[in-house]
Amino acid sequence: MIQPQTLLNVADNSGAQKLMCIRIIGTGNHRYAHLGDVIVAVIKEAVPNMPLERSEIIRAVIVRTCKELKRDNGMIIRYDDNAAVIIDQEGNPKGTRIFGAIARELRQLNFTKIVSLAPEVL
């Protein structure tokens, strides 16, 4: 469960390292964001000499959460960290590589480009 002021790791090579959630997009007045939700975030840490810099406002999709995700078949998935991938307005990732495993549910949410870049889909 991601709420405003939550710090997230960045799971791609766009240049940012840490994000802080500001707002949850498209969920009305929901308090928490879950796997596959799009958030508005600010970059808190970034790699020098990269296109993205600190204090930039960006959009990101959540790909890993510490909170458990229960599937219809009874399987429960939980990750070690909260992580997101930075996307543009069309929903395409800004980076060219994705680090770590991501959930299969992103394919059903039309983030197929992110799923194709990921090394492991759980």
Curated annotation (Swiss-Prot):
PROSITE patterns: RIBOSOMAL_L14. Its main location: plastid. One of its GO terms (biological process) is translation. GO terms for molecular function: large ribosomal subunit rRNA binding; structural constituent of ribosome. The keyword Ribosomal protein applies. Part of the 50S ribosomal subunit. This is Large ribosomal subunit protein uL14c. It comes from Phalaenopsis aphrodite subsp. formosana (Moth orchid).
